[in-house]
């Protein structure tokens, strides 16, 4: 499925195509913009439009060549207001040196020089033309080229390079941003050859739920067997103590000889005999009085 109008060095490998398919980059929406018909492969029976991943790869390479042509990497601004793309743009910026805007785009960042967030980038890359419409609109005012990840229903006004892909799934967004960063580093020479694999895993670009990460951290910090009940708790406690139920404790070693003997026939339920402490103290008191009466 490699495009024929690219030099052979830019052709996608089977692993790249399989990765795009595994991340569901080829699955679009049920709506179709007229400008996205060129990237359509077919429409499924359930109405979902399927994109041509060969053209997706072609546009990834084209976008990477545009980004690599800019001398100062900080002049490239990557933007994502969609939560699934915020982690991806931050990782892309850290690996390529671009400027990232993750979250809400402050209006006037490209047009109002009085604001603190004012920027003058030479190129912007957005995750979704619909959610990042403010950034695209301001870029059109100041003649900034725009690269966008576009779905079948995405508006393409003021978009100069459209990368056809699924821009709603977290795996698809992360996969495309990872491939774009890898191609930029290859063109810059950071990755020496195309046969050399990139040591950064694609999972690093995927969105992660903060609540799920907090729950996983709490689960890791829990004591093993703290929430177990019934036989499982008994077995875990038995294993923790070493499993030796026969060995008596050191404190009870001397008490075994003076313990209750069932053969003696004693009534263990009977009340204990009362100890008359006053009677035992009487002789001592009498001797004390006699000592007082003795005159030396």
UniProtKB/Swiss-Prot annotation:
The keyword NAD does not apply. Residues 245-296 are annotated as: Disordered. It is found in: Cytoplasm. Residues 263-289 have a biased composition (Low complexity). One of its GO terms (biological process) is translation. The keyword Transferase does not apply. Required for the assembly and/or stability of the 40S ribosomal subunit. Required for the processing of the 20S rRNA-precursor to mature 18S rRNA in a late step of the maturation of 40S ribosomal subunits. Belongs to the universal ribosomal protein uS2 family. PANTHER family: 40S RIBOSOMAL PROTEIN SA. This is Small ribosomal subunit protein uS2. It comes from Fusarium vanettenii (strain ATCC MYA-4622 / CBS 123669 / FGSC 9596 / NRRL 45880 / 77-13-4) (Fusarium solani subsp. pisi). The gene is RPS0.
């Amino acid at each position: 499925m490699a495009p024929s109008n690219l030099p052979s060095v830019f052709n996608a490998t089977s692993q790249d195509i399989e990765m795009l398919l595994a991340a569901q980059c080829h699955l679009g929406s049920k709506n179709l913009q007229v400008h996205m018909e060129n990237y359509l492969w077919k429409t499924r029976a359930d109405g979902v439009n399927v994109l041509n991943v060969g053209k997706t790869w072609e546009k990834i390479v084209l976008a990477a060549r545009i980004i690599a042509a800019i001398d100062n990497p900080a002049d490239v601004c990557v933007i994502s207001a969609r939560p699934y793309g915020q982690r991806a743009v931050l990782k892309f910026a850290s690996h390529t040196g671009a400027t990232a805007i993750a979250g809400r785009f402050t209006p006037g960042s490209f047009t109002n020089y009085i604001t603190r967030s004012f920027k003058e980038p030479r190129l912007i890359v957005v995750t979704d033309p619909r959610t990042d419409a403010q950034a695209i609109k301001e870029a059109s005012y100041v003649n900034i080229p725009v690269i966008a990840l576009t779905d079948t229903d995405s508006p393409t006004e003021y978009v100069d390079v459209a990368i056809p892909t699924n821009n709603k799934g977290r795996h698809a967004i992360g996969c495309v941003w990872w491939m774009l960063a890898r191609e930029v580093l290859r063109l810059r020479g950071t990755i020496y050859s195309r046969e050399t694999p990139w040591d950064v895993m694609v999972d690093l670009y995927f969105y992660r739920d903060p609540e799920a990460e907090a729950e996983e951290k709490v689960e890791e910090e829990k004591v093993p067997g703290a929430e177990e009940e019934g036989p499982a708790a008994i077995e875990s406690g038995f294993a923790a103590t070493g499993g030796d139920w026969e060995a008596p404790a050191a404190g009870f070693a001397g008490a075994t000889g003076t313990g209750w003997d069932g053969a003696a026939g004693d009534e263990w339920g009977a009340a204990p005999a009362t100890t008359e402490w006053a009677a035992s103290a009487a002789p001592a008191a009498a001797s004390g009085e006699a000592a007082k009466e003795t005159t030396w």
